[in-house]
Amino acid sequence: MSILSWIENQRKLKLLNAPKYNHPESDVSQGLWTRCDHCGVILYIKHLKENQRVCFGCGYHLQMSSTERIESLVDANTWRPFDEMVSPCDPLEFRDQKAYTERLKDAQERTGLQDAVQTGTGLLDGIPIALGVMDFHFMGGSMGSVVGEKITRLIEYATQEGLPVILVCASGGARMQEGILSLMQMAKISAALHIHQNCAKLLYISVLTSPTTGGVTASFAMLGDLLFAEPKALIGFAGRRVIEQTLQEQLPDDFQTAEYLLHHGLLDLIVPRSFLKQALSETLTLYKEAPLKEQGRIPYGERGPLTKTREEQLRRFLKSSKTPEYLHIVNDLKELLGFLGQTQTTLYPEKLEFLNNLKTQEQFLQKNDNFFEELLTSTTVKKALNLACGTQTRLNWLNYKLTEFRIRPKF
């Protein structure tokens, strides 16, 4: 064999063994073979996909694309995607070695996605679910403003429709190119989950895959009612080398693995990929009859300043509302009036007497359907509200409460 032939064979072998990740949009020139990251065995990509990207030699779970994950979990022809065309922008005009816009364009062309998550609804063994799947191939699955917005919208939709939420996490953390806008998504998603879990009493299952790190781990990834993980998944916040350099200590070999977290009580279950759909199906079947499950209601609060039309509607509502459906916001009004009664007692002593009587008559609300009308038209109460916070603030507060409970005044 000549030297040129040997070099050519080595080049072809290197091309075949290169670890490529095929998406449906990928070009065939990316290769037909890949190598296991754990044992190094060469794997035929077509057969690897059929085995859900689990190594035939050692059982190691290689990374899956979000599309492959959805196909493995959702029943055929039931997937309905949300917000497919929502695309990130570059608010900070960030640039390191390459402009952020160029990185986004490259990732979108390579993966066929607009950002690092796919969200939507579908059926899992006939059970309706709201599903979000992160894709590590898109800029390391980093969480930017679009990822946070899509996940938040998914959770809010699930809350309104009474659906369980399943999020499959695979991320390197918050996206540094978007700065504080990416960090804000941690709080936004967590707030939506609080309403979904604690107010609507609906189920949220978090599936942790390798890797799940950074701001995703510090927020919604670890907030699930149930935490599932794949075997040997890398799960943590800071990197291993960063921790070792900070502590000046050698960490255990299995540190930040799914097995390590399960041993220390931070996970509920480690599920092999081939059994994940079955485990989720059995869990959802058990939860389906839960007595506390209910369709949710999301309190949005006031959105922007009052318009002149809305302000006039609220003024009329203060004078003429007689409908019992508004009575459920009286408790909040009583709390506000109680606070005013404690802070302004020296100027209007008669107001304090009225408010104290109001606090001691809890059953009054049930007996009198016109309580809300009398409360708002009371001269003493009007004086208290106007004195403490002014008419405009009172209208803003009322607008907030009506919007929170999705009430539209009838005029």
Curated annotation (Swiss-Prot):
Its cofactor is Zn(2+). It catalyses: N(6)-carboxybiotinyl-L-lysyl-[protein] + acetyl-CoA = N(6)-biotinyl-L-lysyl-[protein] + malonyl-CoA. A zinc finger (C4-type) spans 36-58. It is found in: Plastid, Chloroplast stroma. It is an enzyme of class 2 (transferase). Pfam families: Carboxyl_trans. Its EC number is 2.1.3.15. One of its GO terms (molecular function) is carboxyl- or carbamoyltransferase activity. InterPro entries: AcCoA_carboxyl_beta, Acetyl_CoA_COase_Trfase_b_su, ClpP/crotonase-like_dom_sf, COA_CT_N. Residues 32-302 form the CoA carboxyltransferase N-terminal domain. GO terms for biological process: fatty acid biosynthetic process; malonyl-CoA biosynthetic process. One of its GO terms (cellular component) is acetyl-CoA carboxylase complex. Binds 1 zinc ion per subunit. It comes from the Eukaryota. Keywords: ATP-binding, Chloroplast, Fatty acid biosynthesis, Fatty acid metabolism, Lipid biosynthesis, Lipid metabolism, Metal-binding, Nucleotide-binding, Plastid, Transferase, Zinc, Zinc-finger. Zn(2+) binds at C36, C39, C55, C58. Pathway: Lipid metabolism; malonyl-CoA biosynthesis; malonyl-CoA from acetyl-CoA: step 1/1. NCBIfam families: accD. Belongs to the AccD/PCCB family. Component of the acetyl coenzyme A carboxylase (ACC) complex. Biotin carboxylase (BC) catalyzes the carboxylation of biotin on its carrier protein (BCCP) and then the CO(2) group is transferred by the transcarboxylase to acetyl-CoA to form malonyl-CoA. Acetyl-CoA carboxylase is a heterohexamer composed of biotin carboxyl carrier protein, biotin carboxylase and 2 subunits each of ACCase subunit alpha and ACCase plastid-coded subunit beta (accD). This is Acetyl-coenzyme A carboxylase carboxyl transferase subunit beta, chloroplastic. The gene is accD.
